[in-house]
């Protein structure tokens, strides 16, 4: 079972999020989540739920039925810690072919080591999983003029 989005995405402006203010440090994190999560939870494993070529529509990117690679994963320690999705259009992975098929490799390995990739915007939304409520972020990145997103739902309340 994966988290379900409950609210629309709202642009995160760096101010305290009233409902989840304790999560603002995670929302504004600009480095690899895995490194920070390992400091908190120990060894982090990546479980790929699905990775496939598909058509995808996205309001924040202005995409309507764009073909690309959609990957869904859990970052896990003793339990699921973060649920993540990433979408790379075919235009993105033509510029960086590894994004066509990441398999079990952590995205941050490439995201934070490529000078052509820059973060443009961060959005927040509320999610639910079972009876629990969580906060998610959606980061919009640019790779040499082409945009893609990474969604991370934090399955904890720090």
Predicted regions and their residues:
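Conserved, well-structured functional cores that handle cations and Mg-NTP chemistry
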Residues: 134
């Amino acid at each position: 079972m994966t988290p379900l989005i409950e609210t629309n995405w709202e642009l995160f402006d760096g101010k305290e999020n009233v409902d989840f203010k304790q999560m603002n440090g995670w929302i504004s994190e600009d480095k690899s989540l895995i490194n920070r999560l390992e400091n908190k939870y120990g060894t982090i494993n990546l479980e790929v739920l699905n990775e496939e070529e598909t058509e995808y529509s996205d309001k924040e990117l202005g995409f309507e039925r764009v073909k690309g690679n959609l990957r869904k994963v859990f970052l896990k320690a003793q339990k699921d810690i973060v649920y993540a999705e990433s979408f790379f259009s075919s235009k993105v992975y033509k510029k960086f072919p590894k994004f066509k098929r990441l398999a079990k490799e952590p995205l941050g390995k490439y995201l934070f080591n490529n000078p052509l990739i820059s973060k443009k915007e961060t959005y927040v939304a509320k999610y639910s999983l079972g009876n629990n409520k969580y906060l998610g972020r959606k980061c919009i990145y640019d790779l040499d003029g082409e945009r893609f997103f990474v969604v991370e739902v934090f399955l904890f309340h720090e």
